[in-house]
Amino acid sequence: MRRRLSSVLINNQCIASQRHYHTSRPEKPTKKASSHEPTHKFTRKPWEEVPFLTDLKEIEDPEEALSLFHQYQEMGFRHDYPSYSSLIYKLAKSRNFDAVDQILRLVRYRNVRCRESLFMGLIQHYGKAGSVDKAIDVFHKITSFDCVRTIQSLNTLINVLVDNGELEKAKSFFDGAKDMRLRPNSVSFNILIKGFLDKCDWEAACKVFDEMLEMEVQPSVVTYNSLIGFLCRNDDMGKAKSLLEDMIKKRIRPNAVTFGLLMKGLCCKGEYNEAKKLMFDMEYRGCKPGLVNYGILMSDLGKRGRIDEAKLLLGEMKKRRIKPDVVIYNILVNHLCTECRVPEAYRVLTEMQMKGCKPNAATYRMMIDGFCRIEDFDSGLNVLNAMLASRHCPTPATFVCMVAGLIKGGNLDHACFVLEVMGKKNLSFGSGAWQNLLSDLCIKDGGVYCEALSEVISI
């Protein structure tokens, strides 16, 4: 039986306010248990999991989660902080913010002491929902829950504001840190620097960086990576390299991402050899090349049609005992398929599976599109089956390509199978995709395949 939380709150006004940090044995319930109704005995040892939390994990529907919360409460279970926080997280994740507000009122009424991490999570969920004002409101109310507010929650709020395009508000809260008796750390400055760089305001970002040094806050590798990345994207490699030297002088060790940003900048300028040289120079600076560095070089070679050189880099990785991941393999698969070297791409797919690297949706999609490109629809269908078995799903465009190709090849049974799969997956072409299919089969080729298409659709 479900009860609205508002009625529970009214009934609970009669109960004396006290903190609850443990469970007590309730009276035995008289009503029949539902599928999610608690049946546990509430006496437990300290190391045992709370029965409410165990049941809550099995529920996806937020309304059912609320119902379970009330059922436990009616049976005498005394909810503590882990119960409240778990329920609040689940409700916030589903964006049931009205229920979140009600539970928070109950938390305050019961004087349950909360951790700052609860409010940080709520601020993030409000930010993802675009509810900036609610995020700010939660931040202001943290102390009213007998919780100490630190720079961590301020950083969370500033980040949410920056992500939602509220840079001025973010700077205002940053400037007000002193009034809140909080001292900004490197994370605080990094968030603002990133925000200004996203707005292409280099001068403002530099001003924040200077302020960071004035306050004697040590810049981190993230700080420099943000600045170097911006300069590389804007083709100012001279300044980017100067910043690299500056961070080394300050004994801030560059990481693989730092060198990756510089390498990508050099590749964009057509200086592949310089980028490759930099990758090997980084070892002398105490930084081992990683997947990101090899990926940048392989992507650049692929774009320039130098796929065989990219394959040599893959072999070099193996010699250095750097295990390629799905991203690395996908770079090769993509460019091989683009160059219509699809059988080679398929061998790469087979190799990655033998090496224990699972293909992702992008891998399968590129392979299917590649086989469609060379009009080998039977092989494409085999890859499609493997993709579906791996619980991945092609895009409507890939389905259209497969259906059109199979119909043109006279393989109507397999075309029907593909449409059947779409139906089982509750997928639809969409009006645009259907138009493309009709155009491909009934217009471009003089309408010779219209009858076959009609037959497939009727089946």
Curated annotation (Swiss-Prot):
| GO CC annotations on file | mitochondrion
Q: Which cysteines are joined by disulfide bonds?
A: none
Q: Where is the composition biased (Basic and acidic residues)?
A: 24-41
One Pfam entry name: PPR
Name the major location: mitochondrion
Q: Which NCBIfam families match?
A: PPR
Q: What is this protein called?
A: Pentatricopeptide repeat-containing protein At1g07740, mitochondrial
Question: What organism is recorded for this protein?
Answer: Arabidopsis thaliana
